[in-house]
Structures are given as structure tokens and as C-alpha cells.
Amino acid sequence: MAPDTGEPGDGPVTQGAGGGGADSAAPRVDWDAAAAAFDDEPDHGLRDADVRRAWSGRLRSWLPVRPGDVLDLGCGTGSLSLLAAEQGHAVTGVDLSPAMLERARAKLAGHDAVFLTGDAALPPVGERCFDAVLVRHVLWTLPEPARVLRHWRSMLRPGGRLVLVEGVWGSTAPVGIPAVRLAALLAPLAGRTRVEHLSDDPALWGRAVDDERYAVVWSSPVTRTAP
């Protein structure tokens, strides 16, 4: 869900209503009202075959090889949830926008997927644990990102992964979280961090981009450590 950065189509996807940004304030947006046109953006709806193929390939490399349980936070209309389900994973999607979730449920009808209304910072999943927590363009909107990351880490099974797709968007008043900042937030957690830069792959966005876009894949130890 894209904030107004002053550059149409350059905004990120965030959950239905974020809090204050990690590095900059997230604008307030009525995501229920935006849901009908949300998938019109190439990297939101993944309607273009080349864009869809690009995201599918990246997601396959980020998620665990074996099919498992994936928690998609700020899932929006469920485009990444659908790719994960098609790759054999059982998906739980969480978003604050009922209108977005209505579209996600329709998109994943017949797949092993459930969608819940809730806050990405405190997902309403009880004591469940997952093999991967997938979050695209959401962390930057949340206050206390270090605390949020620790909570997401606590929801992983041993050997699980945090897959965080983030960036910095706009030139006049940039919003987002730089890769170096996110890597620093993950540094205190026991695990392995890999940063993958995405700005130079126009297939992901349906066009060339010149801002900072990246994915961080954080892998937890195979044996659980103390929170």
C-alpha cells in the first residue's frame, strides 16, 4: 500500500494502517478505499507475466526449500501470499484492511491459506510458530522496529526465516528504511543476515527504478536461542 511520495507508482506496500515510521513517518491512508485499484500497480497485482515470474523466482530463493508455514504480514490483496501458496507453503495472511483481505481471500480461494484482520506488529496468531515470516514494505511504518523484529523472530521455528522487503522511496521527501539501518537492527539477534539489492532488476517493478529497494533474509539458528 503506497504512500504519496510525490512520484506516482514509486511508493511501497504497507499494511492497512501503519504507525510512525522506523526512519520517517508513514502517511495515513484509507486502504479500504484504495483496495479496488491497489493491484493496478505492477508489483502489487503481479498481473504482468514477467513481473510475476520475477517475484516468484525471488520468493522461491527467500523462503525455505521445503513447504512449510508462512506468515505474510501486511499481506494486502495477497499477491505474495498466492506465490507462496503456489510453491507449496501453507499461508497465514494478516492485514488491517478488511477490503484488502476480501480480495486476498478471493485470490487464494482453493489454496491452503487463511487471512486474519490484525496488526502486523502483533499478529493475532496466538502461540503459533512459522517457518517463515514474510513482510513487504511494512516495517518502516511501525514504531519501535527493534522490538517488532524481536517479536517476529520469536514466532519462528528453529531454522526459520524473516524475509523483509523494504526500501527508501521518493526524492523530495524520502520515506522508508535504508538497508544499512535494517541490518543494524537485526545485528543483535543471533542469526545470519543476507541483504539482496533489488533496484537493478526492473522486472520486479515493471520499469526501471533509481531508488533503494532491497530484501533482507534473516535465518534463525537451527536450535532455538533465548529471546
Task: Mark where each language-model region is.
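A short glycine-rich, Lys/Arg-flanked "PGG" loop and its adjoining helix->strand segment in the class I
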Residues: A146-P158
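A short SAM/SAH-binding and catalytic strip from SAM-dependent methyltransferases
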Residues: A132-P145
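Class I SAM-dependent methyltransferase SAM/SAH-binding core
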Residues: L71, T77-L122
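Conserved beta-strand signature within the Rossmann-like core of class I S-adenosyl-L-methionine
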Residues: G160-G167
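A short acidic, Gly/Pro-enriched loop at the edge of an enzyme's catalytic core
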Residues: A121-A132
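Core SAM-dependent methyltransferase catalytic element
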Residues: P202-P227
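Short alpha-helix
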Residues: V175-A190
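Conserved class I S-adenosyl-L-methionine
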Residues: A2-V65, S171
